C-alpha cells in the first residue's frame, strides 16, 4: 500500500525560512515534521522544537546531525547556504533520500555537482518557491519574445539587509530566462555594475540592480524600456509564507510522484 503521510526534515530549522516551514508543516494535513536540524554550535540542540518556535505541540528534539536522523524522514527541505546544502545533499544521495533545495548562491561547479547527484536521488531546486514569481517568469518569456529586441531590459531586485548573495538567485534566473528566449549568451549580456564603465548602454545587455535594506521580503521588477514607453512587470512578496507554502507543495509533489532521481524545478510542479 502506498504511503499517504509525508515526513519532512528541515535543515536550517531555526532560520527565518525554517520557522516558516515548520509553521506551514504544522498546518498541512498528512505532512509531519520529524527532524529539525540546526548548525553544530546551536544552543538549542536537544530542546523541543515546538516550545522554541512557539508554533504548537511538536515533540521533536532539535538536532545538529542529519546522519543520525536519516531514517526519520522521507524528504529533506534545505534553506541554508551552499556549503551546508552540498554536504547534506551528499548524505541524502548515499541514503537515497530526496531533497528540496531553496538555497541560492551556488557557483557553476557547485551547480554541476547538484546535477550529477540528481542521477542518484530526486531533487527539486528553485531560487524562489513563490507561485507568483514563477508565473511572472512565464509571463516574461512571452513579453521578451514580443518586445525584447526593441527595448532595453533592466532587472531590479530588493531584499532584507541580512541576505548575503547579490544579485538574488531569482533575478539571475529571470535574466537567464530572458537570454535563453533571445538566444543571448547570459555570461556576456549580464551587467552587474556601471560605476566605472564611463560609456553609454550597449545593445542587448541586461542590467542588474540590487537593494539590501530593512526587512524587505523580496521584490523583483523587470523593466522593458524604449524611447516611447516603459513596461514594468513586478512581483512583491508580502510574507515568507509564500515561499514555505511553495516548498511544501514541491515536497508533496516529489513525494507523490515517487521519483527515484531527477532534477526538477517549480515549472514541473506548476506545469507551466
From Swiss-Prot:
The keyword NADP applies. GO terms for molecular function: 4-hydroxy-tetrahydrodipicolinate reductase; NAD binding; NADP binding; oxidoreductase activity, acting on CH or CH2 groups, NAD or NADP as acceptor. NAD(+) binds at residues 12-17, 102-104, 126-129. Pathway: Amino-acid biosynthesis; L-lysine biosynthesis via DAP pathway; (S)-tetrahydrodipicolinate from L-aspartate: step 4/4. GO terms for biological process: diaminopimelate biosynthetic process; lysine biosynthetic process via diaminopimelate. The keyword Lyase does not apply. InterPro entries: DapB_C (IPR022663), DapB_N (IPR000846), DapB_N_CS (IPR022664), DHDPR_bac (IPR023940), NAD(P)-bd_dom_sf (IPR036291). This is 4-hydroxy-tetrahydrodipicolinate reductase. It comes from Buchnera aphidicola subsp. Baizongia pistaciae (strain Bp). The gene is dapB.
